[in-house]
Swiss-Prot record:
Purpose: Scytalone dehydratase-like protein; part of the Pks2 gene cluster that mediates the formation of infectious structures (appressoria), enabling these fungi to kill insects faster. The product of the Pks2 gene cluster is different from the one of Pks1 and has still not been identified.
Record protein name field: Scytalone dehydratase-like protein Arp1
Family: Belongs to the scytalone dehydratase family.
Any one GO BP annotation for this protein: melanin metabolic process
Annotated source species: Metarhizium guizhouense (strain ARSEF 977)
Amino acid sequence: MSQSLTSSVETDSKTGSSKAISFQDYLDLSALDWARLRAILAPTLYVDYTKIGKEKWDAMSADDFMAMVSNDDFLGDPCVKTQHLIGATYWERVSESKVIGHHQLRAAHQVYTSPDLKTVKLRGHSHATNEHYYVKSSGVWKFAGLKPEVRWNEYKFEEVFKGSYTQSEKQS
């Protein structure tokens, strides 16, 4: 299977899915490689955060999605480090060009006291399942949205995106 997301990705004939986009999706998100993440996004994404107490967007533009996830109030915060690990997965083929990936997920987060990343201020980890939506465009699978459902959180997960250095700076 090709690991390149800029060319056509080999797909499973039964599910129409691509493991490469799912793996790369999380690799890029955890590494905060914004350019690579942007390259695998569909033009429009379905983003449903209602089961975690947030909003739902039926048609969020890729640019708006990138602005949201890379913002200092979220994953773009230089004091927040994260790693998203995928566990068990199954694929649901909706059509020739649409697939839903059902993923078991653990997202580990650490917030540091400053951007030098020397002192950990707090930790917060989440255990969840996640529906990921994929669409095939010109023979290439693109990430087209997500719908997480948290099972439980560890430590101070609720404070991860509120407790960082940059958030303290904004409140001063």
